[in-house]
């Protein structure tokens, strides 16, 4: 009760944006996601539809404070650089990003991360990223259909630091096969 009373929920909101694309579909995943190899040609159409929905949300929340933005998925960094940049521009056009307390992007899989994508996110004001290896055991990564290595995870983390990110989450799942 104390926590609920500490925030003026009637006057603020958080924004979640789902990006339903991934490099591949992982064995354990229950989220709606579409492999880029089969559905990548639909990214631009998805962003066009997403713009309409975000514009609707922005219009109906003008009188409230945007406290947090969270972009998840899927794997948002499965978007190519052009689409990722377009997404960031849409958000900035429609929402007062600079007023938010936190702006998180699930960078997700190390095999979808590039220096250019991190640059786009950093310039857009992203304050927190997630790099999600799910495990640091190569055998398990292979069994669950993750097309990246443990070494790529380490490299992605160091690249994030190099690009100026100091709030980095890393998801590890226990109980995976292997």
For the regions a protein language model found, what residue spans apply to each?
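N-terminal [4Fe-4S]-dependent radical SAM core
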Residues: 1-15
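Short, flexible hinge/linker loops that cap or flank conserved catalytic cores
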Residues: 7-9, 20, 63, 97
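Structural motif
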Residues: 12-14, 26, 102
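Short linear sequence motifs
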Residues: 14, 21-24, 39, 150
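Short, well-ordered beta-strand segments
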Residues: 15-16, 72
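Local cysteine-cluster metal-coordination motifs and their immediate loop/turn environment
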Residues: 18-33
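Conserved non-cysteine loop/helix-boundary elements of the Radical SAM core domain that shape
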Residues: 33-178
């Amino acid at each position: 009760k104390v926590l609920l009373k500490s925030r003026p929920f009637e006057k603020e909101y958080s924004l979640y944006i789902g990006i339903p694309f991934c490099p591949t579909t992982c064995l354990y995943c229950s989220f709606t996601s579409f492999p880029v190899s089969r559905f990548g040609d639909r990214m631009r159409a998805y962003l066009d539809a997403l713009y309409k929905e975000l514009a609707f949300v922005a219009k109906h929340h003008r009188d409230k404070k945007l406290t947090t933005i969270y972009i998840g998925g899927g794997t948002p960094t499965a978007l190519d650089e052009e689409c990722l940049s377009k997404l960031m521009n849409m958000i900035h056009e429609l929402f007062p990003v600079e007023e938010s307390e936190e702006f998180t992007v699930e960078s997700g899989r190390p095999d979808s991360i590039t220096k250019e994508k991190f640059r786009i996110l950093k310039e857009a004001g992203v304050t927190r990223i997630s790099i999600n290896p799910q495990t640091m055991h190569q055998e398990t990564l292979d069994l669950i259909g993750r097309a990246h290595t443990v070494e790529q995870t380490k490299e992605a983390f160091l690249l994030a630091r190099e690009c100026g990110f100091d709030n980095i989450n890393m998801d590890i799942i226990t109980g995976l096969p292997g």
